Amino acid sequence: PLGQRVQIILLDVRYDRNPLVKVTREERAVRKARNMGYYRANHDPAARMLGEDQWGWLERELRKPADLRLIASGTRVLAEETGHEEWANFPRDRRRLFELIGKTAANGVLFVSGDPHFSEYSKIADASVPYPLWDMTSSALNQYNRGKRPNARRVVGPFGEPNFGVIEIDWNAPKPIVHLSTRNLKGATVL
């Protein structure tokens, strides 16, 4: 209905992505002690997470009318300094994503992501976007990680047992309210 339009965008973040850059053997030992992964940011200007056709499609989608936009990514969008697969490994494309959201005046963007085998919520205030961006990470039902990985943008979590995410929208409020929660296998709210 008008005023309650939800747009769901599913990104393919592997098809056109450049290979991840691994750290040196010496760096691995230091990172392992911090529960970090073995990847680092790729600052090559040609390094990309999405291809040009994908960027064009995404811009057209963000220009469509919507009251809330859920952008799903197989890897975390806002997490930083983890050393694992994430958009921060491609800082140029991550910056481009934030700027595209601002340029298209896409309101109500919420990222939903997976991959690290635990749940957490991350948040960033970026000058390109007139509102804070949130990333709800939830995974997985059969593979999980109890270790606490670093993330400079984490505001809630992590929860490292089997889980799933729930998004509820209260359209009756003067401005829609989005409720995020992480549930365990019994359905109990844990985050």
Protein language model annotation of sequence segments:
Residues 1-191:
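Long, structured stretches of catalytic cores involved in phosphate-ester chemistry, encompassing
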